[in-house]
Amino acid sequence: MAAKDVKFGNDARVKMLRGVNVLADAVKVTLGPKGRNVVLDKSFGAPTITKDGVSVAREIELEDKFENMGAQMVKEVASKANDAAGDGTTTATVLAQAIVNEGLKAVAAGMNPMDLKRGIDKAVLAAVEELKALSVPCSDSKAIAQVGTISANSDETVGKLIAEAMDKVGKEGVITVEDGTGLEDELDVVEGMQFDRGYLSPYFINKPDTGAVELESPFILLADKKISNIREMLPVLEAVAKAGKPLVIIAEDVEGEALATLVVNTMRGIVKVAAVKAPGFGDRRKAMLQDIATLTGGTVISEEIGMELEKATLEDLGQAKRVVINKDTTTIIDGVGEESAIQGRVAQIRKQIEEATSDYDREKLQERVAKLAGGVAVIKVGAATEVEMKEKKARVDDALHATRAAVEEGVVAGGGVALVRVAAKLAGLTGQNEDQNVGIKVALRAMEAPLRQIVSNAGEEPSVVANNVKAGDGNYGYNAATEEYGNMIDFGILDPTKVTRSALQYAASVAGLMITTECMVTDLPKGDAPDLGAAGGMGGMGGMGGMM
């Protein structure tokens, strides 16, 4: 086992604090409407330019191992805030730095670290309740656009796009961010249920100009099995032909003789058919087939529950107003399923989302909810260069997370004002002893840090602005973009409550642990080992020259 380097007490804390400050100082230059960019060197390709706090934090590793431990702990704050709310990483870092700096001063002055931590925790618990009380619901398009704009660093087009996307696909709808092809940002909305499986044979195409299959008011056959024998399907095909409607087959696979017969029937115009593979794999495929059945009012024909394809009737088939199938995707528009059944299915999947343990499962389940509930919107980010595209895409992603958080838990006044108001309301809070009271004061003083940093990045004097804001009440604050005071809600400067809450909770959690640190242990740096291999091994090569 390698030898360890151990530091105690103040020596350890000073090193740790230096690491905290290096990382936090790099991150906090990005805060606010006048925050600057940070350029990150990459081992290959062009450098990345970003204003995203967590991207900056992730890049930082320090040479001194004790300092690096401090930096890594603050990095954890940014990552946790990002995971919980998808935004507010810079605010969380600034709060953590403020709590650690103030807290360690108190420890150096002889306060008990454990009581300080208890005081900080008490203040944060009370602050979270106050934040919830200040929060107002965020339901209208205008508020959503404002939240998106602020999170995308005052880029109004991004805020408007996100609000428009949420209008189209609902608050629960899936909104994804992709690289665009032009200079402008675009919004594409896919209404109805779309899944990524295309037609099984190009001979099904009936719209050669678009290379797609479009079927009006088709029946939809859902089978959880491979179909290779056409005889199984004859009763259904005959019934559909009599009804004079087209048929879409969604099955595990359609192959061989069955596929050939369907193609021939379609080309001769006997019955219009199109076949696609069912989306997903394994259990997820079964679940998605059931989703489609609920949406279209059909039944999944599965041998597991004793149903056979030969005995299927028109009652077992789903229906939709229109189905569009191209090379890679199938879209079902206006399924005839009962609204109550669809809502029941959505509620069932939401329950699974609550119980899901992995992010991947949760994401897939949310996609299923969106497909049943409304549709999918794609924001295509436009930019002139690859570097700008990456930076802008990261901002749009942040803004999207922020708006989701706002819809979930509401909004509070932005620009660091909400935390200042909360701190003022908690001025009378006391702990069980004097050291806890100091801990409470440390937390309350730290709550001013985001406002001070926003002002500092705008080139103004933080103390003057902070005092002016504290003299006001309610949503009165400072708009750093226009350098004027007023009602933050009227200015459209809003922060999602969830983002502010998560930032404060994670910052206090990690900062509290750092304040109570008394000893740090790390590996000793390895000394340079004597390099015997190269010099020793090559000695015999000297004689080779004469042999040539």
UniProtKB/Swiss-Prot annotation:
UniProt subcellular location: Cytoplasm
GO molecular function: ATP binding; ATP-dependent protein folding chaperone; isomerase activity; unfolded protein binding
Pfam families in alphabetical order: Cpn60_TCP1 (PF00118)
This protein's GO CC annotations: cytoplasm
Enzyme class, broadest EC rank: isomerase
Keywords, ordered alphabetically: ATP-binding, Chaperone, Cytoplasm, Isomerase, Nucleotide-binding
Reaction(s) catalysed by this chain's protein: ATP + H2O + a folded polypeptide = ADP + phosphate + an unfolded polypeptide
Enzyme Commission number: 5.6.1.7
PROSITE patterns reported in the protein's UniProt record: CHAPERONINS_CPN60 (PS00296)
Positions bound to ATP: 30-33, 51, 87-91, 415, 479-481, 495
InterPro entries in the record: Chaperonin_Cpn60_CS, Cpn60/GroEL, Cpn60/GroEL/TCP-1, GroEL-like_apical_dom_sf, GROEL-like_equatorial_sf, TCP-1-like_intermed_sf
Subunit structure: Forms a cylinder of 14 subunits composed of two heptameric rings stacked back-to-back. Interacts with the co-chaperonin GroES.
Family note: Belongs to the chaperonin (HSP60) family.
Chain's role: Together with its co-chaperonin GroES, plays an essential role in assisting protein folding. The GroEL-GroES system forms a nano-cage that allows encapsulation of the non-native substrate proteins and provides a physical environment optimized to promote and accelerate protein folding.
NCBIfam families: GroEL (TIGR02348), PRK00013.1 (NF000592), PRK12849.1 (NF009487), PRK12850.1 (NF009488), PRK12851.1 (NF009489)
Name recorded for this polypeptide: Chaperonin GroEL
